[in-house]
Amino acid sequence: MSPGEYVALIEGYHEQGMSDGMPVMPVSGARLAAMIAAGGQTGGTHLGAFPGRAPVRVEDVAECALLAGCVPACMPLVLTAFEILLDPAFPARLLYESAGSFFPFVLVNGPIRAELEINCRPNVFGPGVRANATIGRALRLGLIRLAGAPNAGDRSTLGSAYKFTCVVGEDEENSPWSPLHTGFGFAETDSTVMVLAAWQPRQVTHQLSAKPEHLLSTYAEELSTATQFNPLDVKLAEASIAPKALLVIAADHRGFMRDAGWNRKRMQAYLHQVTGRRAGEVRAAGYRSDKRLQGAADDKWIPVYRGTEDFLVVSAGSGGGRSMIGGAVYADIRKIPAAPRVAVRAPALAIGEEADPQTLDDYVALVDGFMAQGASEGWPILLPDADSVGAKIAASGRNGGDVVGHSPWRSGPITVADVAINAHMAGCSHLHMPLVVAICELLFSPETANGLTAGASTAGYHPWIVVHGPIARALGINCGASLFGPGARANSTIGRSVRLVLINIGGYKPNVVDRACLGSAYKYGCVIAEDESASPWGPLHPEFGFKPQNSAISLFWAAHARLTLNDEAGEVEPLLRGIAEDLTTMQNFDSPGARGPEDDKTAAGAETWGQFITNADALVVLGGRHREILRRAGWSRRQIQEFLFAHNFRSAGELRSKGYATSPYLSPEQDDAVRIPVFHGPEKFHVMTAGGQGGATMVVRALCKAHRRLNGD
C-alpha cells in the first residue's frame, strides 16, 4: 500500500461522513474482530437505538472505537458508555438536536483508569493522552454515524471543543475523599463509568486564598450565573432533566479543603446553601420560564440545584490553584464488566526506522508507533512521507527552509518544512498551507511572546484563531452552526496543525513543558471564521486596521471560554447583562498577572506580571438569535462595547469577601464601595458574529492578541 493509497482511504471515510473532521484510524477485518473480542460480547448483540434510528450493535460500536483510535482494551468501557447513551432514560437527543452544545462528559473510576492509563492529573481536559482523547472521540463518532450528528442533525448554535472528547479519570490515589463511585453503592475495586449530558465547563482560578468558604463561594458564583436558568431544551430532554453540578477539584484546592477538615458532605452542604440567585436578578437577564420564578418576589432565593447530592465532587488535576466547574442535566453511572484481555502487539514500526509498509495493518502499526512516541496529541495522524510533505511545502508558496519563528522551548528555528510535516499529520489540505504557515508565523512572533510563555503555565492558555475576509469562505472555514466543533474539516485540521506544531516542534509537550493544571479541550485546536454576511455591523477586522475586503487573521492567547445560553431574553439590555456577567465573575480577578514571580514560579513569565490587569481583551462571539435582537434594536458595535464595559465592574468589598483581598486589582486603602473593572475600556471588547440560529454567545478572555493581513488577498 502506497502513502497515496492510504490517504485516499482516509479521504473515503471523510466523504462517507464517518469522521469528525480529522483523520481516523482505518478499519480492517482482523482489527475489528480483535476489538469486538475485547468487549466480551458478540458483534451482532443489540445495545439499543437512538431515537428514530436503526439498532446499534456491538460491531457498530467497535467500528467507532477503531476509527477514533482506541486500543482494544478500551472496548469494555466504550461499550458501557454506549449502553448509557442508548438507555431511553438518557436525554441523548440533547447531545445532537439541541442548540445548546451539550456533550457526553465521561468520568472513570476504579482500577480500569490505571489499566488504560486514563489521565487524571495535569492537562486532564486537554491533549496528550491517547485514552482520554480516543474514548471520548469514539462516543462522538458514534453520535455522528449512529444518531445522525452533526451531518444530519446537530443543531448546536456554536458547538464546543468538548464535543470532540471529554474523558476524565478521578485521581483516587491523591484524593482526600473516597472515590466518587463509592457514593453510588460501588466498591472501590469496581471499575465504573459515569456519563453526563453536560454543557461547557468553566475553569475557576483562585490562588489568593486557602479558605474553603472563599473557594466554594467562587465555584458557586460560576454555577449561579443567569445562564444556568436557561430552559435548556427541556422539550428535547422530556422527563429526564435531573440537573447536576460537577466540580473537578485540582490538587491545591482539595489540599486546602483537606487541611481545613472539610469532607465531601460538608462541601456539598455549603455549595447547596450558596448556589442560587435572587428571582429579580434572574429576571433582569431576561429569563422568565423557570417555574420557580412564577409569582416569586424579586428577593426570593432560587437555588440552582435541588439537593446536596446534586453536587458531584471529583478529584483530578494538578497544582496551580484551579478547579473546573460544570453543569449537566442528567447523569448515569454503571459498572464496567470484566472482559477478556486481548493481547496487543507492540508497534512493529517506529519513527525514524527504514520502513516499507506493505499492508494496511503495517500502516496502522506505524501510526501507533508515532503516537506511542508522543508525536500526536492522542488522535490518529496521517503518516508524513517525502512526496506529501513536498507537495505541502510547494502549496505554501515558500521554501522548506524558510524560518517561521522561534519557540522559547526550542533552540533551533521553526521552518516551513516543520509546519508542513505537522500539517500533513493533522490531515490538513494542501490548500490550507499558506494560512497554516501565516498562523504559525504570528504564533511565534514577538507580538505574542507573552502568550507563548503563558502557554506553558498551569493556567491552560491556548491560541484562538479567527479568520477574516474572503479567504475564510474560499477555504471552507465554518462560521455557522457548530463552528467550534465538531464536523468542519478545515476548522478541525488547521487548528490541529497548530497544536501539533506546538507539541512536536515548539516543545510544548503535555505534562513536560505544558504544565496546565487542568487543560482544556480547546487546546486540541481552535480556528473559526466570522460570519461577515450576517453581521449587522460589518466584519471585525477593520477594527484592527484592515480593509473589509482584506483577508486577515487574529490570534488571541486565551483562557477558558464561557458559553452564555439565553433563549428567553428578547430585549437588548437583559441579553447583554447576562453576557457581561459571564465575563466578570469573581475568578477573573485572579490571573497570572495577579502576582509577582516570587509568588508563583509556574505562571506566565516575568514580562507579563500585571499586564493582564490592564491589557486583557474579551472576544465576544454572538450567535444568531442574540445578534438578531441587537440588529432589531439598532444597536451599533460601539454601543455594545460601551454597555459591556459599563457592566464589567465589581466592588472592592465583593472581592475581599471571596478572598481576593490581595489581588493587585485592589489597593488596601480602597473603600469597599469602589468599583473595579475587569477590562479597561470599551475597545477591549471585540464583538463578532458567527454560529447558527440559537440563543448562544461564546466569550473568552485573552492575555494578548495579534493580527496579520494575508498575502494574496
Predicted features and spans:
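Loop-centered beta-sheet repeat module
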Residues: 140-199, 499-558
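Long, compositionally biased
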Residues: 99-113, 458-472
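Residues forming anionic-ligand binding surfaces in small-molecule and nucleic-acid pockets
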Residues: 114-122, 196, 473-481
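Fold-independent oxyanion-binding glycine-rich loops
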Residues: 27, 109-111, 169-171, 198-199, ...
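Short, acidic Gly/Pro/Ser/Thr-rich loop/turn segments
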Residues: 113-115, 173-175, 202-203, 254-255, ...
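Generic secondary-structure boundary/loop-capping signal
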Residues: 19-22, 47, 103, 192, ...
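Alpha/propeptide regions of enzymes that mature by internal proteolysis
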Residues: 1-98, 120-157, 165, 203-247, ...
